[in-house]
Amino acid sequence: MAGVSRAGIMLTGLGLTGAALTLLLGFTWAPTVDPSAWNSPEAYRILYWHVPFAWCSFLAYCILFIGSVAWYARRSELGWRMICTGSDLALLFGLGVVISGPIWGSAEWGVPWDWGDLRLNTYGLLTGVTLFLVLARGSQPDGQGTRDTIAAIGLFGFALVPVCLLYTSPSPRDLSTSR
């Protein structure tokens, strides 16, 4: 593990421990809600994992956006590393959202995915763009053309973030009654 600092290994271990503890507490000790009062199944606890995944994926897309702009503005190696890091994190957290969301949807509304719902489909497209970015980085020869293409697709992916946020906001309508 040449080139990996001791502090990096310790921070990674600490982060993974924190994530595991959060998962454990989210499913066992999270505040309980009377399901009969809230008309919600016991599966609501998945939201303690699902919602942070979503916010972290949006933050990862901000890293991807900043990296893409830095790459186009200065051909910065730091910008390219931000693109790589942002796309990896966005895929990790995006898959967490796409996996945990249907669990909640099945329990709450009886369907795991509603193909007519703009926010679900936009977020699915966003995760698909991220998957493409990660796979393209691994399968294409590293060069300026490849980096330009990946940065452009990263900018497109970031453009979907405000759409997802706009349609995810519960203020326009109560999401539980929209089904």
Predicted regions and their residues:
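N-terminal membrane topogenic signal
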Residues: 1-14
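Alpha-helical transmembrane segments of multi-pass membrane proteins
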Residues: 18-34
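Short aromatic-rich membrane-water interface segments that cap or initiate transmembrane helices
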Residues: 41-56, 114-115, 119-121
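Hydrophobic cores of alpha-helical transmembrane segments in multi-pass inner/ER membrane proteins
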Residues: 53-67, 124-137
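Membrane-interface helix-boundary motifs at transmembrane edges
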Residues: 73-84, 140-147
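Membrane-interface helix-loop-helix modules in multi-pass inner-membrane proteins
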Residues: 89-137
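Hydrophobic alpha-helical membrane-insertion segments
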Residues: 153-166
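Conserved small/polar residues in nucleotide/adenosyl-binding loops
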Residues: 167-174
